[in-house]
């Protein structure tokens, strides 16, 4: 039913760096329900348990993810994490992911005194361990369509980060897109060059932007807690002055992987 989409995706793969050229179609969500042989788990999560809407379903031949959660009305010093998502089966074998995604709605009730949190919709994964064998030390990377309250109205920034043991690298930005813009995002582990490759294609302008995120860790040990995830959600600010919340609605399609 989506052969034309698959063809376009394969043509676009030819322009990717070598680390991501062997991608193959993983799921195009043509059939309900969510395929448990491809998606090992799904989640609705809020770190404080304060959530309302949560959707994880195939609708109109796309994976539909929606989540709304709330901050704590206590002080101005923290945040609450929440999201809806799905985890790839056989995550330890996946080295690259490419998917279409559209953030259709991104609405935040923010906190003026604690404004630096917001949405994160996209991909993340753990790829290797630096040698300790402890899963909390696994090295990973993320690529998200992100928004905080101070960003330009209606805009999402597409950013990548690496992380290890709870420490995150500075953002690597691929630019901005308007909410509602269909895009294709890619995240790949380029082990021979000790870096991650991130990419963004705006499906309206057909402009592709890519960047590398190098690291200095030893990368010969497999991840102790391998995971690859697609999600929609983010962080709400704790706030003394007002109730805060974050609502994100997104659709994913045409997921490709490299092994």
Regions found by a protein language model. Give the residues of each.
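Bacterial N-terminal signal peptides that target proteins for export
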Residues: 1-8
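Boundary of Sec targeting at the N-terminus
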Residues: 20-21
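Short, tryptophan-glycine- and acidic/Ser/Thr-enriched carbohydrate-recognition patches
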Residues: 28-53
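Short tryptophan-centered beta-strand motifs in secreted/extracellular beta-sheet-rich domains
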Residues: 29, 181-189, 196-198
